[in-house]
Amino acid sequence: MPDAMSAGAILRALLPEMLLSGGAMLLLLASVWTPQGNQPGAAEGAERTSVLARFGVILCLVVGLAVVIAWGDGAAGTPDGRVAGDGFRWAVDLVILLGTALALMLLEAEHQRSAAFGPEVPSLMLLASTGMMVLAGARDLMFVFLGVELMSLAVYVLAGVNRRSARSAEAAVKYFLLGAISSGFLLYGMALLFGATGSTRLQDITEWAAAQATLSPLFMSGVALLLVGLAFKVAAAPFHLWTPDVYDGAPLPVTAFMSATVKTAAFAVFARIMIEGLAVAAPRWHMGLWWLAAVTMVVGNVFALSQRNLVRMLAYSSIAHAGYLLVSIIVGDAAGTSALIFYVVSYTLATMGAFGVLITINGGRDRAPTLDDIAGLWLVRPWLAIAMTVFLLAFMGMPVLGGMGFFAKWYILQAALQAPAPQTILAVVLVIASAVSAAYYLAVVSAMFMRPRPEGQPVPSTTPLNQSLIATAAVALLVFGLYPTPIMELARRATTTTSPTSNPAAPRGEVRLQTASVPR
């Protein structure tokens, strides 16, 4: 009976991941199934991709409902504590599913223009999302590695999924080679931590570190290598060099998926490992992470200034946003992690909306859109120019017109300044970096509204699906920018501990992520 009870608890804890992976496998089977073994024609294959993308969106909604029910019912993690059942996991899962659903909608919109994607692509996105959800709940380094590899292997393929494009193939090779190196750092760091502590569970690692008078060089070497591997996954400088080339070469829907959803999952596991698992070692890793955040904010924004290629500009912008999110991890308390959740919601909406506009103006061409392509957009598609302005101002953090983007940065600044150990200098760097970002974001706005439309430039045409995605993302950013309380309240509930500190070994100011009860 105890074994049956344990099996039931494990099934309940992993039900969302099982639903998503099972649905992904069914869609994969549907992508290759043909009646009586007949090979589908090109038109049938193209239509099948669109249909499977729609089923993928429905699957994300179903799994999202399962996550909401699990959160509301107080579903716990696995009995051995290797998978969390806390609000942080469920909140991040919902953001991941939101990003995946929007990316699938972008995929269909792009596919209707270029017919560049095979019917297996929606399944690959869903499998990658399964790995991301594993990362969101992982409390064991082996589960972390399992989630990273499941996510990464699918995304490597997605980057090169347009087999008619040499740029896409180049992006896939670069991402695979550099991703394999980063996974080596990650795995070697985990091995050293296991060698030092005798366990891969975050709770055991924390308890071991708390019992030591001094932390061994073996342990700290493992922490350093783990930090390098995670920094690559979130595209933090100087481990960001792959980002512009891969984003530029990958298909636009895949780039949006990588920029928003992959980053959300990577930061979720980054936060859980550093705040929950390695909090005792914070005095040793804090300064390294501090410099990583500062350099990332500066490098991302400075290199974005000279870009005319809009995808490369957004790639460097995403590097800068990684720096902002690192500040929330450095803060290391409930305010910081709740600000992180709010930020990734805002960033996901703005990124998906912005790439929806880029897909529209690019018209299915095998190249990244430039400033010339978006010039004079106000003259031919005013609503697209207005929506793109909302997304860019959200990235910048402009009050009111930037919607949620302003409060996303405000909450991180507030957490940094009100932390037990205030991060005043980092807050100043964040403000200055955001001011620098205004130059390249407003350059795009200026091109849309102030420059004439180049002769011979086609008028962008949109599909109803892409129109609805862009409009929904823009309206959501504006509405929750005027009334951010519901999202922020959910983020606070997701990251508030049930006691003043559920990790007695953590240093002052460190709050362990919620472990059992669900917010009421």
UniProtKB/Swiss-Prot annotation:
GO molecular function, one term: NADH:ubiquinone reductase (non-electrogenic) activity
GO BP term, example: ATP synthesis coupled electron transport
Pfam families: Proton_antipo_M (PF00361)
Keywords noted in UniProt: Cell inner membrane, Cell membrane, Membrane, NAD, Quinone, Translocase, Transmembrane, Transmembrane helix, Transport, Ubiquinone
Catalytic reactions on record: a quinone + NADH + 5 H(+)(in) = a quinol + NAD(+) + 4 H(+)(out)
EC number of the protein: 7.1.1.-
Subcellular location: Cell inner membrane
Source species, domain of life: Bacteria
Signal peptide: none
Membrane topology: Multi-pass membrane protein
InterPro entries: NADH-Q_OxRdtase_suN/2, ND/Mrp_TM
Role: NDH-1 shuttles electrons from NADH, via FMN and iron-sulfur (Fe-S) centers, to quinones in the respiratory chain. The immediate electron acceptor for the enzyme in this species is believed to be ubiquinone. Couples the redox reaction to proton translocation (for every two electrons transferred, four hydrogen ions are translocated across the cytoplasmic membrane), and thus conserves the redox energy in a proton gradient.
Protein name: NADH-quinone oxidoreductase subunit N
Gene: nuoN
